[in-house]
Amino acid sequence: MRALAEFIMRGRVQATLVVAGCAALPLLYWLGAAAGCLVLLRRGLKDALGVLALGLLPALIWWLQFDDPRVLLVLLGSSSLALVLRASESWVRTLLVSVALGLVYSVMLGAAFRPQIEALAQEIVKILPLALGDLYQQLSVDERARFASLIAPVLTGLIAALLQIVSVLSLILGRYWQAMLYNPSGFGREFRSIRIPAGPAMLLLAGMVVGPNFGPQMALLAPICSVPLVFAGLALIHGLAAQKRLAKFWLVGLYVTLLLFMQLIYPLLVVLAIVDGLIDFRGRLASKDADNANGEG
């Protein structure tokens, strides 16, 4: 990874080759987005504009020729987040801005893939009686209709949230490269300090829980609003592991468990981030450790 980061920062030609080359490959576009973030974070928009403009050409081809806007959305989205992070130096603000980015993604995806999403939603509606069993039979006709109307917006929100996550991960990789080259160990301290305050955390929770009550289309807010909280939850785990000096094995176990049991660990991270916004686990633990060191605990 270090060799690739050094190659990207060697000059505009090298950076453009990586961004454009990765954007042309459907499974590596996230790597091109990370390269664009690295250039933007280090050199600013003026120097990065030419690199990004040429790198976006393959993404435009994917959209115009294959009706797939995802590569373009991630490249533009991660670059936008990089601009926010460079200007604010705040991961919390950047993660909150990613919610707006997710909403933009949902609009674009809804326009580009509406027939496919609606067809998939209809197939899911057909299997609901089998999936829910007796619970589905207990629902009234109106409740079944309302439940069915939420499926397409939720699917759109899930796809948008996935692209939102990829955009944030690309930014994280770009920031990690920047720290590796110019500020070793700086990224770890920066990431472990991420904590969404109580106010924004409650707003995100409201978007997830209350949003669907304002209409079926608002159901897409649930997955999109959860993304900043998940990253804050991961930062909390990293921060606590660092404070307790736990072996990296525990963090590896966390990510393996997250991949294997996503449906369980993902909401748990959301809950942890919300509670941390109210309690501040790391701050309390640091204060307790300081008291113990002073002989007061």
What spans do the regions from the language model cover?
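Hydrophobic transmembrane alpha-helices
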Residues: 1-54, 248
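Hydrophobic alpha-helical transmembrane segments
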Residues: 16-17, 49-53, 72, 95-96, ...
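Hydrophobic core segments of alpha-helical transmembrane domains in multi-pass membrane proteins
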Residues: 31-39, 71-79, 219-230, 266-277
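Short helix-perturbing small/polar motifs within transmembrane alpha-helices
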Residues: 59-64, 71-113
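Membrane-interface interhelical loops and short interface/amphipathic helices
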Residues: 108-155
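Transmembrane alpha-helical segments in integral membrane proteins
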Residues: 156-182
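Small-residue-rich helix-loop
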Residues: 181-235
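Long, positively charged, glycine-interspersed low-complexity recognition regions
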Residues: 223-297
